[in-house]
Structures are given as structure tokens and as C-alpha cells.
Amino acid sequence: MIVKFCGFKTESDIKKIKKLEVDAVGFIHYPDSKRHVSLKQLKYLAKIVPDHIEKVVVVVNPQMSTIKRIINQTDINTIQLHGNESIQLIRNIKKLNSKIRIIKAIPATRNLNNNIQKYKDEIDMFIIDTPSITYGGTGQSFDWKLLKKIKGVDFLIAGGLDFEKIKRLEIYSFGQCGYDISTGIESHNEKDFNKMTRILKFLKGDE
């Protein structure tokens, strides 16, 4: 079960996950997000994440020049595309660095399957998130029944997840590879060590 914790902004929050069995840590590089980090911050924060943890940057409709700066100046090894990016952009990223993993976030709408078909041969994994004009980070869930239609691709579930919602999702057989959590691991706008630990213990089989 893959667990990705997202929306990290500070060194103190990074320190909280150093001894946890989290698979991936995400940083938001999108100025309209309340969790946005600058390229300078991204470079520093990614460097202090332990090497065994996947380092993900979340971008929305980025210019290729932005992607080049991220790849060339930081330790990021995965790019999460959260907008309406073109297939050509994805191919250009792969040409620039074939080792970079690409995650594509897809809003959970009636067009979910069409969007999956569009991108599935170009990317490494999907994240299914709540539809929003702000491209994620809403803290709101979506209709999980839409997940029943997904077949033959790897995906994480996102969208306002916390411990209780994850417990409910684990009852169903949607075929997800794991979860992407941000708001549900926070207290007072900081990452909450106890919330993160509780989720990891439950999903990694210790609880």
C-alpha cells in the first residue's frame, strides 16, 4: 500500500517524517496554493528528505522552463501534474530526463475514464482527486462510486482523506494502490505527527 503525504512547507514538518514508513512526500510548486513553496524552498526541503522516500513536486499547467529548473536544480524524482497538461508536455519531460516518474492527477468527474484513457500510456501512476477550480487541496471528498469504473491502471485516492475516511475506503475493493493525504494529516496548518503515524500504522499492517 503506497502512502503519499503532501503539502510540506517547512523543515520542522520534514523532520517529523524522517523515521516514518511513508513512501512519498509532496511539495506544491503552484503560487495559487496555500501550500506553495518557491523553487529555493523546494531545493532545500527536497534535499533534507531521506533518500528512501520518493520526492514529488506538484505543478499545475507548468511551462517547460519551470520543469527544467526543477529537474536541474532540485533532488525531486517525481513530477505530479495537476492541471490540463498536454501529452506533448509529458513526452518532453521524459525526453529531458527519462528517469523522472510522472504522476497525473485526474478530477473525479463523469469524464474520469476518458481522461484516464488519454494519459494512461504516457504516465506512471494516477491520482484521483476532488474536482476543483483550485486544482486540489480542498479538503473535500468526492463520490467514491466513480472509482468502480477504473480498470487496469495504478492509482492513488486523494480528496479530503483522513484516518476515518481511509478506514472506510479500505472496506471497499476499488483497486487503489494507496492514498495521497494532505489536509487530513494537519493540525493548525502544520503536519501532525500523531495523525501521520496513526494512518501509517493502519495501512502498513501494524494496527
From Swiss-Prot:
Keywords: Amino-acid biosynthesis, Aromatic amino acid biosynthesis, Isomerase, Tryptophan biosynthesis. It is an enzyme of class 5 (isomerase). Pathway: Amino-acid biosynthesis; L-tryptophan biosynthesis; L-tryptophan from chorismate: step 3/5. InterPro entries: Aldolase_TIM, PRAI_dom, RibuloseP-bd_barrel, TrpF_fam. GO terms for biological process: L-tryptophan biosynthetic process. It comes from the Bacteria. It catalyses: N-(5-phospho-beta-D-ribosyl)anthranilate = 1-(2-carboxyphenylamino)-1-deoxy-D-ribulose 5-phosphate. GO terms for molecular function: phosphoribosylanthranilate isomerase activity. Its EC number is 5.3.1.24. Pfam families: PRAI. Belongs to the TrpF family. This is N-(5'-phosphoribosyl)anthranilate isomerase. It comes from Staphylococcus epidermidis (strain ATCC 35984 / DSM 28319 / BCRC 17069 / CCUG 31568 / BM 3577 / RP62A).
